[in-house]
Structures are given as structure tokens and as C-alpha cells.
Amino acid sequence: MSDDLSMKCGLEIHVQVDTNSKLFCKCPTNYKDVFPNTNICPVCIGHPGAKPMPPNKKAFDIAIMVAKMLNCEMITDKDIYFQRKHYNYPDLPSGYQRTSVPIGEKGNFLGVGITEVHLEEDPGQYKPDLGTVDYNRSGTPLIEIVTDPDMKSPEEAREFLRQLMRLFRYIGNLRGEGTMRADTNISINYNGIQGKRVEVKNVNSIKGVYKVLKYEIIRQKNILRRGGEIKMETRAFMESQMITKSMRSKETADDYRYIPDPDLQPIVLDNSWIERVESEMPETPISKEKRFVEQYGIKEDDSKVLVSDLDLADVFERVIKDVGSDETGISLAVTWVRNELKRVLVYNKIDFFESNLKPEHIIELINSIKDRTISQKIGKTVIEHMVDQKGEKTPKELITELGLTVIEDVSELDQACEEAIKNSEKAIEDYKSGNIRALNSVVGQVMKLTKGRAEPGTVVEMLKKKIDG
């Protein structure tokens, strides 16, 4: 008898807003490259009597933008106020976390329901193994996105998060996967037995969420198979062991003793505020994908690859603008941005931003190929050197330095063709017998002899004249 197994998963995703100052004070939000406990003040370390400033307006703008791009209904008919969420942990100096009521709710992204979007403050960083706490992070604005339990497999959850992180890159002012933390809620139904919901806290990567779900499915299935009962509990992800470990029974809202924060005035999201934020919203990745296909006539797969990296998509459009928006220009842009540049970036495990290249570098390279200063084969070599050297030299500088210009000396090219013909008797015989493709082998010999500096079209013409007489 085969197993009848299904799962439901919902996520609570926390992502930092990249603002200059914290949510309720003027302290800087930089905490990674500074000495511990330096970017702090009485507000963000919870000193008694310290009063918070009004919430960071920029953080609110970004939260509104996120809610709108997740197709949420905006809360405009009642006040947005902050609550105190009480719990005791060393990284929470005041004993409570300030968290807003929903800014937007009842949204949908890629078929997954969005329960709500709200703002809250990040706690500090506690290191249990050292017994130390760094409060530089305390008070940094966080956006929390709570989904409905609509994901039916680890693969669905992984793809949802990938697309969400891509959306965040387009929005900007969000610190993305490097600071993302997700609380993963999962329940399974095994052969008609419904297990209780289990929450796994603070999973800090997309890969981690995927591994948690795979592990929990197996763990919960084995419990139900043996006739046991799934406890409603909170678990921790032990990343080094790729397992989850029980922390405590699952909390309810009552456990956190939510109360409105008396030190903060309610905020009203009026239509003019929302309309202003909407006017500043960028094009979404999905919209850009469709536009690239319709406007430039490229394949859907090519569009997806380009749009997966916002900077790469921008370079693609810059190339078309400078090289030409006709069929030739678009073809060159696809070949050299989507295919060759992307190939080298993937090989080096970096994105365009990390390469330090400029759009002008790619345009200069393509123009060098277009005007036959270099061959396409040499173009591939140049783009590899450009990425290796972090954009320190322009294509023209590299072409000159490496001696990669197309051979213009006819006698040098003639000599290479003669030698290739001499070494390709079988290919020449096949070509003369009507196998036109056999000539490609001879062309390849010439390209090898000239180290790619010959222009293929010129080589073909010269070979045909010599062979055909």
C-alpha cells in the first residue's frame, strides 16, 4: 500500500529595510563592520524612560511598496499603531519588541496568499556559545511578510522565496537574502491522519528553508507511521547537522501579551501617501519579463535569465540603446549579455554588480566585434579577462595589451590557410565531393593557427578561392 502524504507550509519572512537610521532612533543601521555595541543609544537598548522617536518614514514607504507589490489591500480605514510584543531573551533588552499591526493584508504573490505585511524592530545579536550580545542591530527596521499555508512542497516554498528575493532586489532598500530570516510553519497529513502545526524558527537562507521542510516531512511522517502524535511546538534548525530540535511548546498570541505602545502615536495611511509611494514603485520582474518578450522579440527563457539579475537587465537595454534596436542589435545584445556575459558571471559565481564592470565596457566590446576589430572568438576571451580583472581595464586596453586584434596582413592569413589546407586532406576531399560542412574543419584549423585572430567570414572566402580554384 502506497503512502498518502501531503503537506501545508506557511512562512513568516523577515527582511531588513536598508535605511540610514533605525526604526525609532537616529542610530546608524550598520552593524556588520563595526565594533560591538557602538551604534546604540538609550532607545535601542531599552533604557527605562527612554522615549522612541516617531517611526522612520523611509521604512514605512518601503513597507507600503512591498505590500502593494504583493497585491495587498492597504489598511486605510483605521489607525496603524505599534504594539509591544513581550518575551524574554538576551537579545531583547527592553523585554518587548515593537511591532506594528498590519499595513497591508489579503494579498497574493505567485498564487500564495499573503496574510499580512507589517513593520517591526530587529532584536540584537545573541551568541549563546560565547554568552555575548551585540545590540548594534537592535532597532533596525524589519518588514515581516506572513503567508497563508498555501505551499504544498519544499520545492514550491523554495521557488516562492527565490521569486520574493528577486522582487526585493527590484524594490531596492531591502537587504535581501543575506539578512532574511524565515519562520517555517509546516503540517502534514499522512494516510488521513492530520498532524499539528510545527514552527521552525529563524531559518536564514532559502536553502535552509528547503532543507527544514524536507527534514520535517520525514520526521513527522515517521512519528505518524509509528502511531505517535505530532506536538504543536517551536523547533530550531541546527544547520551544521541539517536537523531540527525542539525548543518549546508553540506560543499563542496571548503568550506574548500584546499591548499598544503608549509612547508612539498611531499613524494614518491616507490615499495621498499610498499614491506617492505607488508613483515611485519600480517595474516588477514579471512585468519586465513580459515587456522584453513583446518589445524586443526575444525568447521567454532568455528574458527570464536577463531579468533574474536587475543589473544585467539594465545592461541589456543599454546595449540595445547604443548598439541598435534593430534585429542585429538585439541579436548582439542577447548573444553577448544573456549568453556570454552571463556564462562568465555564473562561472565566477558573481552577479553583474559584483563584477565591477560598467555597461560601457560591454557596449565597447560589442562594437569592437561589430566593426570586426576582433572576432567573436576573441570577444569571448576578452570578456573573460574583463571579469577576471574586475573591470580594471577596458576592452580596447585588453585587446591591445594581449595583441588580439583581427589579422589584417593578407600574407599572414594566406600562409595560415595554405597550412590548414595541407593538413586537412580528408576534409578537402569531402568538401570537393559535395560535403559543404567539411569546410568548417579547415576553417577551425585556420582559427587555431591564428589563435582566433582571423575573421571567420574572410577565412571562408579565402579558402573557397584556393580550393575551388
Swiss-Prot record:
SMART domains: GatB_Yqey (SM00845)
Covalent S-S links between cysteines: none
SUPFAM superfamilies according to UniProt: GatB/YqeY motif (SSF89095), Glutamine synthetase/guanido kinase (SSF55931)
One GO BP: glutaminyl-tRNAGln biosynthesis via transamidation
InterPro entries cross-referenced by the UniProt entry: Asn/Gln-tRNA_amidoTrfase_suB/E (IPR017959), Asn/Gln-tRNA_Trfase_suB/E_cat (IPR006075), Asn/Gln_amidotransferase (IPR018027), Asn/Gln_tRNA_amidoTrase-B-like (IPR003789), GatB (IPR004413), GatB_C_1 (IPR042114), GatB_Yqey_C_2 (IPR023168), Gln-tRNA_amidoTrfase_suB_CS (IPR017958)
EC number of the protein: 6.3.5.-
Entry-linked Gene3D superfamilies: 1.10.10.410, GatB domain, N-terminal subdomain
Protein keywords: ATP-binding, Ligase, Nucleotide-binding, Protein biosynthesis
GO MF entries: asparaginyl-tRNA synthase (glutamine-hydrolyzing) activity; ATP binding; glutaminyl-tRNA synthase (glutamine-hydrolyzing) activity
The keyword Zinc-finger is assigned to this record: no
Catalytic activity field: L-glutamyl-tRNA(Gln) + L-glutamine + ATP + H2O = L-glutaminyl-tRNA(Gln) + L-glutamate + ADP + phosphate + H(+); L-aspartyl-tRNA(Asn) + L-glutamine + ATP + H2O = L-asparaginyl-tRNA(Asn) + L-glutamate + ADP + phosphate + 2 H(+)
Broad enzyme group: ligase
The UniProt record lists the keyword Glycoprotein: no
NCBIfam families (UniProt xref): gatB, PRK05477.1-2, PRK05477.1-4
PANTHER family: GLUTAMYL-TRNA GLN AMIDOTRANSFERASE SUBUNIT B MITOCHONDRIAL AND PROKARYOTIC PET112-RELATED, GLUTAMYL-TRNA(GLN) AMIDOTRANSFERASE SUBUNIT B, MITOCHONDRIAL
Function comment: Allows the formation of correctly charged Asn-tRNA(Asn) or Gln-tRNA(Gln) through the transamidation of misacylated Asp-tRNA(Asn) or Glu-tRNA(Gln) in organisms which lack either or both of asparaginyl-tRNA or glutaminyl-tRNA synthetases. The reaction takes place in the presence of glutamine and ATP through an activated phospho-Asp-tRNA(Asn) or phospho-Glu-tRNA(Gln).
Entry's family note: Belongs to the GatB/GatE family. GatB subfamily.
Subunit text: Heterotrimer of A, B and C subunits.
UniProt-recorded name of the protein: Aspartyl/glutamyl-tRNA(Asn/Gln) amidotransferase subunit B
Organism: Methanococcus vannielii (strain ATCC 35089 / DSM 1224 / JCM 13029 / OCM 148 / SB)
Name of encoding gene: gatB
